[in-house]
Amino acid sequence: MLLRALFLLPLLALLAGCGCPGYTYRHVPGRTARLVDGYAEAPPDAPPQVHAAIAAGNRIAGLPYRYGAGHGLGEDSAYDCSGAASYMLRNAGLMRGVRTSREFRRFGESGEGEWITVWAKRGHVFCSVAGLRFDTGWTRGPKGPKWTTRDRPADGCVMRHPAGL
């Protein structure tokens, strides 16, 4: 029994480092977007892609959630998680086309970004842009794309980010 425990402890420690931490709101003066009446305001000195991502997110914030929605290349009347993330990142010039939550697991570069982070797992994706979370779930009120400062777990997610951001 002791031998088994000695084997399992290092294995558990290794596996504990494989997940990503949950999203936690942190205000950093000059680098964190403001949330005003459900819409995000980019920090003045943020890169142009961050301003564009926030503007795109604001255009669809408050729309309803519909599974499979937002997977065209134009505007839609509702969005699911990957449709909303795709819309925002595509309109910021950071990707082409539309991706599923599973495909976002290979988006951009590995790890947390300085300005934009994509949190993806099979079945769900959400983003943080200049410190605010853009998500279709785990928020108060009805499901659908919206900005929030509310923390959320990210069990099973990988963090990815656009190169340079």
Locate each region found by the language model.
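Bacterial N-terminal signal peptides that target proteins for export
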Residues: 1-7
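Intrinsically disordered, low-complexity
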Residues: 5, 17-64, 140-165
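Short linear capping/connector segments at secondary-structure termini
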Residues: 37-39, 68-73, 102-107
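...with weaker cross-activation on analogous glycine-rich loops/strands in unrelated enzymes
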Residues: 43-46, 54, 86, 90-165
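Active-site nucleophile-His-acid catalytic modules used for acyl/amide transfer and hydrolysis
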Residues: 58-78
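Active-site nucleophilic cysteine motif
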Residues: 73-92
